Curated annotation (Swiss-Prot):
Amino-acid racemase able to utilize a broad range of substrates. Is mostly active with lysine and arginine and, to a lesser extent, with ornithine, whereas is about 10 times less active with alanine, methionine and ethionine. With phenylalanine as substrate only a trace activity is detectable, and is inactive with glutamate. Plays a key role in the catabolism of D-arginine and D-lysine, that allows P.taetrolens strain NBRC 3460 to grow on these basic D-amino acids as a sole carbon source. This is Broad specificity amino-acid racemase. Homodimer. GO terms for molecular function: alanine racemase activity; arginine racemase activity; lysine racemase activity; methionine racemase activity; ornithine racemase activity; pyridoxal phosphate binding. It comes from Pseudomonas taetrolens. The lineage of its organism: Bacteria, Pseudomonadati, Pseudomonadota, Gammaproteobacteria, Pseudomonadales.
Length: 409
């Protein structure tokens, strides 16, 4: 497949000029370590180190050494702080880390991690070249991309380790579709591209449903075996991996050589798996408490009218901090162990809650937006029900919008 080195060099040069090598804002190795003063922050997230390590240990026990773990820490460890958690990953002996951005790769390597580092999405060519110093293994699921990646590797005088992605489960995102003759030819051709070392074949499941996962797994096993036979790949040198958190917990036969848990590491699992602990809590403060008469309206658009004389607490958090407008007149927060309702529209930096039935609430009190306070809890189920989306859609934003504080327990 002909390709102009001059055109490739020009395109990469323009990409590097127009975009930084990092696909996310620079991350800190120490951002949020316990010296952060919560009194200086309008909102913050607390990251439970002991819970994170418990979840890794629980998963290691369940796998019993039969499959290795690749801890997926993309999106700054799902908003939990990759720099904060890498010491635990290293201490727990996790052999592989999965990331999305070059910035995450930098933090992983600077933490002292010497193990396997995988990018769990297809890179832009400019990203791929900039990531070479991190010895990151790249996902390849397209022949044209493979050829261009090969030229980059050749120019740097080194082979590029790749994971060949197959579209076995119908995700239609990063993998070669092996159901067509052209797709099968392309997959074999990728294994023959010079300067690329295929060390793994992988897929990704599209649905959290055991039957769907098993169907995708059956297709993957058949396609991967066909590919290894036709391309004459040494099975002993190929890692097969497919399982995300759901498949890891619910479909044991999907474990293969390696699993790629993400959410499970942070306690985000299906409800039946209570053995995994929640790692993040989202918190704020009460700024003030005011009294308003019956009939007053609350917030922009007058969406809530007080049905009685009421005490309203002003909370120092809003949608710019990740507490979305979806919680308008629907959300519940915890103050001093009381469940109190959000009233009126959530503003950019403020929300109001009705504390009429919680007379002990005062300025300066801690507010739990997600997590525990005493015996009370704001649960994943109620948050997802109100927001109408996965909890990860929220906590990745909470963690990347607010200071993070690492707690030992």
């Amino acid at each position: 497949m002909p390709f102009s080195r001059t055109l490739l060099a020009l395109s990469l040069g323009m990409a590097l000029l127009q975009n930084p090598a990092f696909a996310a804002p620079p991350l800190s190795m120490t951002d949020g370590v316990a010296q952060v003063n919560t009194q200086d922050s309008n909102a913050w997230v607390e990251i439970n180190k002991a819970a994170f390590e418990h979840n890794i240990r629980t998963l290691q026990t369940a796998l019993a050494g039969k499959s290795q773990i690749c801890a997926v820490l993309k999106a700054d460890a799902y908003g939990h702080g990759i720099g904060l958690l890498m010491p635990s990953v290293i201490a727990m002996g996790v052999p592989c880390v999965g990331v999305a951005s070059n910035e995450e790769a930098r933090v992983v390597r600077e933490s002292g991690f010497k193990g396997q580092l995988i990018r769990v999405r297809t890179a832009a060519l400019s990203e791929l070249e900039a990531a070479l110093p991190y010895n990151m293994e790249e996902l390849v699921g397209n022949l044209d991309f493979a050829v261009k990646a090969s030229l980059i590797a050749e120019d740097h005088g080194r082979p590029l380790v790749v994971h060949l992605g197959l579209n076995s489960s119908g995700m239609s995102r990063n993998g070669v579709d092996m159901t067509t003759a052209q797709g099968r030819r392309d997959a074999v051709a990728i294994t023959k591209v010079p300067n690329l070392e295929v060390r793994a074949i992988m897929t990704h499941f599209a649905v959290e449903d055991a039957a769907d996962v098993r169907a995708g797994l059956k297709a993957f096993n058949q396609q991967a075996q066909w590919l290894m036979n036709v391309a004459q790949l040494d099975r002993s040198k190929i890692t097969l991996h497919a399982a995300n958190s759901f498949a890891t917990l619910e479909v044991p036969e999907s474990h293969l050589d390696m699993v790629r848990p993400g959410g499970a590491l942070f306690g985000d699992t299906v409800p039946s798996h209570t053995e995994y602990k929640r790692v993040m809590q989202f918190k704020s403060h009460v700024a003030s408490v005011n009294s308003y008469p019956k009939g007053n309206t609350v917030g922009y658009g007058r969406t809530y009218t007080l049905g009685r004389d009421s005490r309203l607490a002003n909370i120092t958090v809003g949608y710019s901090d990740g507490y979305r407008r979806a919680f308008t007149n629907k959300g519940i927060v915890l103050i001093n162990g009381h469940r109190v309702p959000v009233v009126g529209k959530v503003s950019m930096n403020t929300l109001m809650v009705d504390v009429t039935d919680a007379p002990d609430v005062k300025s300066g009190d801690e507010v739990v937006l997600f997590g525990h306070q005493g015996k009370a809890e704001i649960t994943q189920a109620e948050i997802e029900d109100i927001n109408g989306a996965l909890l990860a859609d929220l906590y990745t934003v909470w963690g990347n919008s607010n200071p993070k504080i690492l707690k030992d327990q």
